[in-house]
């Protein structure tokens, strides 16, 4: 199973929750997998699929998890989702969708895309305002020059768009529903997994919903305007207008 979606959308919680179900194991964000993704973008799906399967099979063997159904939760898998699902024909993708305004708020707080940020993530991919591999060709300089809020909204838009690429093999979980009505959020996931709905509901019910809607409190009018300008169409399409 691949849990995908934008960073700060609840992918970590969802991956851990589903990985705790009987017969499953949470693989967390597999670092070699995450590090390989930028170089696989644009490769034919069959080529990328072979590389991804090789990485994950090695990790599963080393982690003694070969007898369980793995739950991989790297958000960047969104950009190679078709290849990942080709590598594992029986796998399901779970796309965790959260209000992009709340995601932007959280990304601004973390500072991963901020002009002043230094350092790197767990896959040694650097933080800061530079253009990531998912920025549209020809817009790299623009990305580095816009406001932090615009970059945060840009990231959310690109991730949710990419994660929607294989709808026939993807279950969608809205973070807001997950925290307010775990049973409703769990039902389609349980059905696709062939799992007991009550078990999925129970693990989803452990989510904390205090961060839902925090953009109303934490974003400045200028930041909100930047987010709406960059991602307004995507927000509206997903019901967050």
Language model regions located:
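Short beta-strand segments
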Residues: 3-5, 70-73, 95-97, 172-174, ...
């Amino acid at each position: 199973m691949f849990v995908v979606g934008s960073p700060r959308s609840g992918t970590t919680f969802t991956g851990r929750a589903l990985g705790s179900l009987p017969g499953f194991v949470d693989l967390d964000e597999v670092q070699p997998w995450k590090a390989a993704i930028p170089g696989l973008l644009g490769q034919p799906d069959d080529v990328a699929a072979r590389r991804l399967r090789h990485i994950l099979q090695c990790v599963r063997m080393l982690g003694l998890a070969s007898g369980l159904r793995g739950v991989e939760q790297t958000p960047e898998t969104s950009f190679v989702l078709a290849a990942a699902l080709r590598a594992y024909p029986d796998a399901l993708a779970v796309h965790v969708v959260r209000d992009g305004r709340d995601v932007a708020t959280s990304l601004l707080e973390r500072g991963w895309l901020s002009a002043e940020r230094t350092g790197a993530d767990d896959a040694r991919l650097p933080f800061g305002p530079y253009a990531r591999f998912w920025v549209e060709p020809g817009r790299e300089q623009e990305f580095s020059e816009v406001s932090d809020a615009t970059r945060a909204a840009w990231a959310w838009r690109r991730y949710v768009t990419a994660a929607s690429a294989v709808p026939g093999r993807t279950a969608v979980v809205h973070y807001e529903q997950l925290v307010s009505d775990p049973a409703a959020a769990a039902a389609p996931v349980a059905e696709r997994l062939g799992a007991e709905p009550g078990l999925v509901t129970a693990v989803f019910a452990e989510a904390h919903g205090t961060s839902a809607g925090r953009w109303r409190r934490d974003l400045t009018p200028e930041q909100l305007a930047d987010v709406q300008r960059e991602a307004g169409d995507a927000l509206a399409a997903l019901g967050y207008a």
